[in-house]
Structures are given as C-alpha cells and as structure tokens.
C-alpha cells in the first residue's frame, strides 16, 4: 500500500518520535504527519486539511481526553489508539478505532495493528471496486 497518509497525535514529543521511527521502520513508504498533541490544535488541523488514512491517537492529550477530539473533529480516518491506560479500551471501539496499543508499544503489536489497518482498507477498496463494476453493468 503506497501513498498512505498517517497522522500521529501525541502530546509527549519523545513518544511521538519513537512511534514515528517505529512506523517508518515497518512502512518506510508511508507519509507521516505529526499533529500537535492537544485537542484544540488537532481539531483545527482536521478542519483545514484532508483527513489522513489512519491516525495513531494518544488518549490523554495535553488539554484533555482524545474522545473530545473525536466528537469535535469527526475524523473519517481509521484510528489506532496509543495509550498507557487500559481502562478506555471498551470505549475506544465505539468510535472509528481498529486497534488499541498499550505503551510501551512493542514492534510486534504495532505490526499487527498496521496489518489490521491494511486488511480493513483492502477489503473496503475491494468492495468499492465491486460496486463500480456493478454500476458499469447497469
């Protein structure tokens, strides 16, 4: 999968750099965007830019809980949560989330989450192609 746009929303710069490095190691062809790790900045960014394909989202941001960001920004992106807190896992799957990574993130778990994203998007793209084929027949 090429031309995948990835956003990292993380308020701790060392954690953001570490996650970026891990993603680049696994998928060097992906474009990574680091968005400031606050709800306010993230909502503003999403209001003025095309939404990326996937967002790695920390749950506790500098100005609150990332579920508020989701309510305000309504991202169309698939979300992989990255957090040190396991108590939000159930709620995470009520939004556009496909995985939940506990910090410290292990490379193997990140690879599993990325593969899940790739599987979901390939199935979605396959369905779109099938629908387009049906429309052409009509």
Language-model features: locations:
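Acidic, metal-coordinating helix/loop segments flanking the phosphotransfer/catalytic sites
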Residues: 20, 35-54
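Charged docking surfaces used in two-component/phosphorelay signaling
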Residues: 17-21, 25
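A generic structural motif
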Residues: 27-33, 77
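Conserved beta-strand positions in the Rossmann-like core of class I SAM-dependent methyltransferases
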Residues: 7, 33-34, 80
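Non-catalytic signal-transmission and effector/linker regions of two-component phosphorelay proteins
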Residues: 1-5
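Conserved acidic carboxylate
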Residues: 10
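CheY-like receiver
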Residues: 44, 52-135
């Amino acid at each position: 999968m090429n031309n995948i746009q990835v956003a990292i929303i993380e308020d701790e710069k060392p954690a953001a750099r570490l996650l970026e490095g891990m993603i680049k190691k696994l998928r060097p062809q992906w474009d990574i965007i680091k968005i400031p790790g606050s709800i306010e900045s993230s909502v503003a960014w999403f209001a003025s830019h095309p939404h990326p394909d996937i967002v790695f989202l920390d749950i506790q941001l500098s100005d609150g809980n990332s579920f508020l960001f989701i309510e305000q920004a309504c991202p169309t992106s698939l979300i992989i949560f990255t957090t040190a807190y396991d108590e939000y896992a159930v709620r995470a799957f009520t939004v556009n989330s496909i995985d939940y990574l506990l910090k410290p993130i292990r490379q193997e778990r990140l690879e599993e989450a990325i593969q899940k994203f790739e599987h979901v998007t390939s199935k979605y793209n396959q369905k779109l192609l099938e629908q387009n084929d049906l429309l052409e027949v009509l």
